[in-house]
Amino acid sequence: MAFWGWRAAAALRLWGRVVERVEAGGGVGPFQACGCRLVLGGRDDVSAGLRGSHGARGEPLDPARPLQRPPRPEVPRAFRRQPRAAAPSFFFSSIKGGRRSISFSVGASSVVGSGGSSDKGKLSLQDVAELIRARACQRVVVMVGAGISTPSGIPDFRSPGSGLYSNLQQYDLPYPEAIFELPFFFHNPKPFFTLAKELYPGNYKPNVTHYFLRLLHDKGLLLRLYTQNIDGLERVSGIPASKLVEAHGTFASATCTVCQRPFPGEDIRADVMADRVPRCPVCTGVVKPDIVFFGEPLPQRFLLHVVDFPMADLLLILGTSLEVEPFASLTEAVRSSVPRLLINRDLVGPLAWHPRSRDVAQLGDVVHGVESLVELLGWTEEMRDLVQRETGKLDGPDK
């Protein structure tokens, strides 16, 4: 009986760790350290976790031996998707013929999963607007990329001739992506901080798309906003940090690359703006903004997708090429009965090569697509007032 008593006590202690939430601030919590893997893995993983803390299978628990912390789960790392085989040319010629914004429903495909969509019928942009107006969609998850920031004056990383990469030709980069790779950063951090100076919060202002997302939040419809952007314009527009998952990092915080001491992003702003590489005042190591480089783990908040996407009743995808994983594959994480609305220049990612019958694509200029949706929603006046009010705050009385 004593043996089983100690085992029950150990299990209760471990369960106490599991129930903590990912959103708990300040470092890696117990849920982040063990909860996702143990809860999602099932009974075998729980018992394996107990065995991992106390030896091989069948070894009695030692009451005098404290529980050891289970290993931290592997957080997804950023990497670029390999190009998939091109779709038939006649298909793409029908949607790339001009720059005019067009709307169409993507044809149904064979989808396996709960809530199959093949019998739901196709949707249009107006149908999506009516679902929102009728509050049939109240848990909206949004995925955004660099395309929503280009109207603010920030060039797209991958646009030939206008991307930020092309502005760094003065540096002897072995290839453009090297600026976001740790080995090159440790060898020469100057190119990255030149880029950081241009992107640092305060240099650019939100545009209509950012304020549309803010309006979704104000109306209580935004479950979560997943952004690939590091410009911080979602925060500037007034969307609270609790609603954001900045999948590729943020300038709002920074970390010493040597002693791992954390710093507020504003602490290194003066150095960045003065073209100086920021240094840790304790160990003199380089202080790097918490931007995710290729091969680095994504922020712990990215794990919220495990809960958010199954709960979503509408997925909006705005201004992204869906080329970087694991962000791109999140589009497949919603239920197959959930509408997916893409507002983008081109048909991309799973919506191109694995479409569903309830997919809607509004192709063309992103801002024009958002304005069309706002008009169908009847939010034009509210949007205009919000933009004027927030722009006035950013400009200030003396500007």
Curated annotation (Swiss-Prot):
Q: Which residues form a coiled coil?
A: none
A Gene Ontology biological process noted in the UniProt record is: cellular response to stress
Main location class? mitochondrion
* Modification type N6-succinyllysine: residues: 122
**Effect noted on mutating residue 17 to G/Q:** Reduces targeting to mitochondrion
Q: How is the cofactor bound?
A: Binds 1 zinc ion per subunit.
Free-text tissue specificity from the UniProt record: Widely expressed.
Query: Which residues does the entry assign to the active site, renumbered to this chain?
Result: 248
Could you name the Gene Ontology cellular component terms for this entry? mitochondrial matrix; mitochondrion; nucleoplasm; nucleus; protein-containing complex
Q: What are the binding positions for Zn(2+) in this chain?
A: 256, 259, 280, 283
GO terms, molecular function: enzyme binding; histone deacetylase activity, NAD-dependent; NAD+ binding; NAD-dependent protein lysine deacetylase activity; NAD-dependent protein lysine delactylase activity; protein lysine deacetylase activity; sequence-specific DNA binding; zinc ion binding
Functional summary from the UniProt entry: NAD-dependent protein deacetylase. Activates or deactivates mitochondrial target proteins by deacetylating key lysine residues. Known targets include ACSS1, IDH, GDH, SOD2, PDHA1, LCAD, SDHA, MRPL12 and the ATP synthase subunit ATP5PO. Contributes to the regulation of the cellular energy metabolism. Important for regulating tissue-specific ATP levels. In response to metabolic stress, deacetylates transcription factor FOXO3 and recruits FOXO3 and mitochondrial RNA polymerase POLRMT to mtDNA to promote mtDNA transcription.
What more does the record tell us?
Has some ability to deacetylate histones in vitro, but seeing its subcellular location, this is unlikely in vivo.
Assembly information from the UniProt record: Upon metabolic stress, forms a complex composed of FOXO3, SIRT3 and mitochondrial RNA polymerase POLRMT; the complex is recruited to mtDNA in a SIRT3-dependent manner. Also forms a complex composed of FOXO3, SIRT3, TFAM and POLRMT. Interacts with NDUFA9, ACSS1, IDH2 and GDH. Interacts with PCCA.
| Matching PANTHER family | NAD-DEPENDENT PROTEIN DEACETYLASE SIRTUIN-3, MITOCHONDRIAL, NAD-DEPENDENT PROTEIN DEACYLASE SIRTUIN-5, MITOCHONDRIAL-RELATED
Write the protein's name. NAD-dependent protein deacetylase sirtuin-3, mitochondrial
